[in-house]
Amino acid sequence: WYRIKTSFTGIKRLVTLPQEDKDACVNAYKFLQRMQGGEETTTEDETKAIAAYYKVLNNMLSVFDLEKLYIPPQLDEKEGLYGNQLLCEQAMLKEMALQDPEKSHLLDMGCGRGRIAHYIASMTGGQVSGYNIDPDQVENAIDWAAETQMSERLHYKVGNHHDPLEYESGLFDGCYSVQAVWPFFKKEELDDHAREMFRVLKPGTRYSCSEYLLSPYFDWNNEEHVSLHRSYLPTLAATQSMYPA
């Protein structure tokens, strides 16, 4: 029933979305294509395009039962997409090495619809705060937390990753991101964001992530490699993701 309801809600949201939002999504994709084609763009315009694109994309994918908007590594070939997502999230949680999971308060950078935060909080028994640029996804995350009676432990906020994080220093017992940080920052911007994540973490705690990188077999001198890479990035609304493994 949950899957049917999710698909129905996604269809309803798509049908009722204002035409300007749909147009903004298409224009955002075209913008990202031009950017990968070599057009000079600003961080501000890139960020606006990402928000406009994901506002529609998250509802489209929910129709097909994909609410966690990431492709996990294949940790177990016997498991499907969802099963490997759970394994990936379990591995991230283990990497954070929480001292007292039930009393922990974690930060989910780029939380999307809040499904990962929900699963992490279910495993720890503690709290998770989610931060995301798209108000539509944050609204969905808040609704899901309320529906599952997790509102007291799941907290969501709309915010721009490129700005200082709207949290006090030393607040969190751990931080994680799932394909939601590295693809959207230029190399020189990653250091600034890393400093912000470091600022809001308690001393001695960890940041864990699952991010996609270029494999050692990628060849920048191979035109086919480069062409496929640049044509793929706009589909994810990724601005960069050009970092070697």
Please give the residue ranges for each predicted region.
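N-terminal auxiliary segments of SAM/dcSAM-dependent transferases
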Residues: 1-63
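Conserved alpha-helix/loop element of class I SAM-dependent methyltransferases that forms part
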Residues: 79-102
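Class I SAM-dependent methyltransferase SAM/SAH-binding core
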Residues: 105-107, 117-163
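Class I SAM-dependent methyltransferase "Motif I" SAM/SAH-binding loop
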Residues: 110-114
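A short acidic, Gly/Pro-enriched loop at the edge of an enzyme's catalytic core
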Residues: 163-175
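A short SAM/SAH-binding and catalytic strip from SAM-dependent methyltransferases
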Residues: 173-188
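A short glycine-rich, Lys/Arg-flanked "PGG" loop and its adjoining helix->strand segment in the class I
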Residues: 191-206
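Short, glycine-/aromatic-enriched active-site segment of Class I SAM-dependent methyltransferases
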Residues: 209-237
